[in-house]
């Protein structure tokens, strides 16, 4: 799904987020000032290697998705499942991810440009997949973590201390 974000110079950046629903894994993201169907198609190709493509892709009916995008999905063997018009609740998992990105990360930072946003989202994606707990996953992270019972608990700041990862040594 796409979401927009203004920069410090009031330039609008578009971010495409791709996630796998099963364990809420944030697979990839892309940032651009001009999202075209070709650019979105390239992002999908990068998100899903040919041997790991999903059976379905749930998306909204944004005008940015065009015939080029649909053709790329068909070539990859992915069935396109657009949601109903103005019905974001039909794609609730990715909408929740976008809300988390905004509330837990981007609302606390000023973005300077595309490269800066990529660095921020890269760090937050690693935190989201490896450390952030999810209630729907019984307080586990999307990438399963082993539970350490012994050792000293240490804190590692993420995104300049906006979040912390706690682990035992």
Residue ranges: model-predicted function:
Residues 1-169:
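Charged DNA-binding/catalytic regions of mobile-element recombinases
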């Amino acid at each position: 799904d796409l979401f927009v974000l203004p920069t410090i110079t009031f330039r609008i950046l578009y971010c495409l987020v791709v996630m796998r629903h099963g364990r809420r894994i944030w697979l990839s993201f892309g940032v651009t000032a001009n999202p075209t169907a070709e650019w979105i198609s390239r992002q999908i190709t990068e998100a899903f290697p040919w041997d790991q493509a999903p059976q379905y892709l749930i998306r909204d009916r944004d005008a940015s998705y065009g015939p080029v995008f649909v053709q790329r999905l068909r070539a990859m063997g992915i069935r396109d499942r657009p949601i109903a018009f103005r019905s974001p609740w039909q794609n609730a998992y990715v909408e929740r991810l976008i809300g988390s990105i905004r509330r837990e990360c981007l609302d606390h930072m000023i973005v300077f440009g595309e490269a800066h946003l990529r660095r921020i989202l890269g760090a937050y994606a690693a935190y989201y997949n490896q450390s952030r707990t999810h209630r729907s996953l019984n307080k586990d992270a999307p990438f399963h973590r082993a539970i350490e019972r012994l050792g000293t608990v240490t804190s590692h700041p993420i995104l300049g201390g906006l979040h912390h990862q706690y682990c035992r040594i």
